[in-house]
Amino acid sequence: MKKFRNSITLVARTLVVTTALLATSSLALPATADDDTDLETTDVSPVGIDSSGNPLSWHPTNSEAASSADSEDSVAGHESDSAESAPSSVITGDGRTQLTDTTSYPNSAIVYITKDGKTHCTGWMISADTLVTAGHCVYSFEREEWLSGLEFSPGANGSERPFETAKAAQTWTDTSWVKKGSPLLDWGVVKLDKQLGERSGWFGFTWRPGEYKDVKAELRGYPDDKNPGELWGMSGTVAVSRGNQLCYSMDTHSAQSGSPLYMSDEALVIGIHAYGKGPGRFTSRECPSQYNAGTRITKGLFELFLDLRSRASAE
């Protein structure tokens, strides 16, 4: 097996969901001088359920996470022998291209998420049985309920499921998303009932305390404006850094929520795509309205992901 070094508001309910789901178009505007100054972060507070809907208790267990550095840290991804090497909105035109080599890493580790058989969201593997997505992909703040009927297929290509399909054994998101619909903590983690990542591989991820402005990045996922199960992506750069969000002009569409935002040179995930551009952003801690936005991997999220990926699905 080969290994790649990958660095592991309270608002109205309707506005939160609308911002997360709608797709619009306009010309991106330049960032202002102070766009990267607000790097204050909000701490994570996990809440979860098992496959029967029973609440799960949270208690950190991973010593690897507890000992992570204060300046920045990373965790390696994994390329399986089975994989070969290799809401979002359209900002101006559509720069996305279709990616058909879904059995090649890292595309193989990007997860097509369906709900009741229909295109729903995107995720990305972080271990053999663990994936990351957006919080609104697993919990509806508007309806105040965990979403059911979800299935997860890494490396999907149209109707093809080269690494099979799994269901959720555990589902996690943030208390701030559940109670407030906070866009600053719109993250989700799913423990699967199968070890799909053993064949698909998984991403590494990273965090740093400073800004990511002008970092070259990739954004790939399964949008619902294309044929079901088609993987589309675009290259670009991070335009603005916030404490809990990263902002960019790479084109996306609904159902690309949960997509990995990863650095181009090493395939290291730094954020989780969650929102399209537009109104409904009320604080300086959110991305400027002309940009698409992703939940930033902070130190807290980094440590949480390490912890959750090390847990047994039956815990």
Please provide the spans of the model-predicted regions.
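Protease-domain processing segments flanking chymotrypsin-fold serine proteases, especially trypsin-like
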Residues: 29-125, 314-315
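Short beta->alpha transition motifs characteristic of CBS
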Residues: 134-137, 254, 271-279
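Chymotrypsin/trypsin-fold serine protease catalytic domain
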Residues: 158, 168, 183-256, 284, ...
